Each structure stands twice: as C-alpha cells, then as structure tokens.
C-alpha cells in the first residue's frame, strides 16, 4: 500500500475507533487527525467531511460489477438484488463485524440522517450505471437502483441495531423481497 493508502486507512481506522468509543456526534475531526498522527488538513484531503470517514462505502465497486455481470434479459430489480447478494456473500467474517459496528454507529448518530441519503446517492449512481451498461433505460435503472438501495439500507440498519439475526439472513430476506422472490 502506498503512502496515500496507508494514511487513508489510518484516518478511517482512527475515526471508526473514536466513533465507537465516544459516538459520532462527540468526536471531532481534530481528534481523528490527532489519533491518526496527521494534521486536520490532511484528514480533509482524504475525506471532505467528517461523515465521509464513516459513510464512504467500499462495497460500491464490487456491487456494481456484480450487477453488470447479471444476464442482460434479467429484470432490473432482480439484477440489482442478485448482484448485491452475490457481492455481499463474499464478505469475510471480519468485514461482517466491521460493517455491523459501523452501521450501529450510523444508526445511533442523529446528525447523520441526511448523510446516509447523500451517501446512498453514490451507491444508486454506481448501480444505475451498471444497469445502463447491461441495457436498461435510464429511468428504469434509476428507479430500480433507488428502490433496492432504500430497502437494503433499512434492512441493514435494522440488522445493525439487533443481535437477533445474521447479516446473511437479513440480506436474504431483504433481497428476496426487493428482487420479487
């Protein structure tokens, strides 16, 4: 990993650790930068806002690639649901726990409500482009991607708040519903 990547990961790790310890709203960007051993200006070169430290979604590229690889004649909603199912099924146990921890922080932070929607727009755009690449029209692609991301976000936040189910079970249920199974 190059210097940029190491710094980026150090900032993300410092942020996630502090958010878990103190809560998102009680953690400042200066504290994140200090914990990572860099200046606050460096933090903002990597993450334009504090919310991006927590909300930047590392799964968008793999989900979009999985959607693009779905059969061209498959309905857009089903293609998105199945592409996401395939992408998320490859998560390691460590990624699952990290995702639950991160989503719990997000679910508990009142000030992130608008940030979640802004972050989801990036995911919707990536999935929309994937659907268009497989031949869907723009309006159909946008509607399908938006519907699946909204439903999946709800399911994931519910899963993060509870210890009663596994990620696999929560995803299966949500994606079955969204994909019309």
List the model feature ranges, each with a label.
Residues 1-22, 26-41, 55, 62:
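Basic, helix-initiating cap at the start of DNA-binding domains
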Residues 1-4, 103, 175-176:
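N-terminal intrinsically disordered/low-complexity leader segments
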Residues 19, 28-29, 50-56, 77-80, ...:
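Amphipathic alpha-helical segments enriched in hydrophobic/aromatic and basic residues
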Residues 64-101:
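Hydrophobic alpha-helical connector segments
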Residues 109-134, 142-146:
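Amphipathic alpha-helical packing segments from all-alpha helical-bundle domains
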Residues 129-132, 164-181:
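C-terminal peripheral helix-coil segments that are non-catalytic and often amphipathic
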Residues 145-164, 180-181:
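Amphipathic C-terminal alpha-helical segment
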């Amino acid at each position: 990993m190059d210097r940029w990547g190491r710094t980026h990961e150090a900032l993300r790790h410092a942020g996630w650790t502090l958010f878990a310890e103190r809560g998102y709203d009680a953690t400042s960007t200066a504290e994140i930068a200090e914990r990572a051993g860099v200046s606050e200006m460096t933090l903002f070169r990597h993450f334009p806002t504090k919310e991006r430290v927590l909300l930047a979604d590392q799964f968008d590229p793999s989900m979009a690639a999985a959607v693009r690889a779905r059969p061209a004649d498959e309905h857009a909603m089903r293609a998105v649901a199945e592409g996401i199912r395939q992408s998320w099924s490859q998560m390691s146990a460590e990624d699952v726990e990290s995702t639950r921890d991160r989503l719990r922080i997000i679910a508990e932070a009142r000030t992130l409500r608008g940030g979640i929607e802004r972050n989801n727009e990036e995911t919707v755009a990536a999935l929309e482009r994937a659907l268009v690449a497989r031949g869907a029209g723009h309006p159909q692609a946008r509607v399908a991607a938006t519907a699946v991301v909204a439903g999946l976000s709800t399911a994931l936040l519910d899963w993060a708040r509870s210890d009663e189910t596994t990620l696999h079970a929560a995803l299966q249920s949500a994606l079955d519903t969204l994909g019309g199974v």
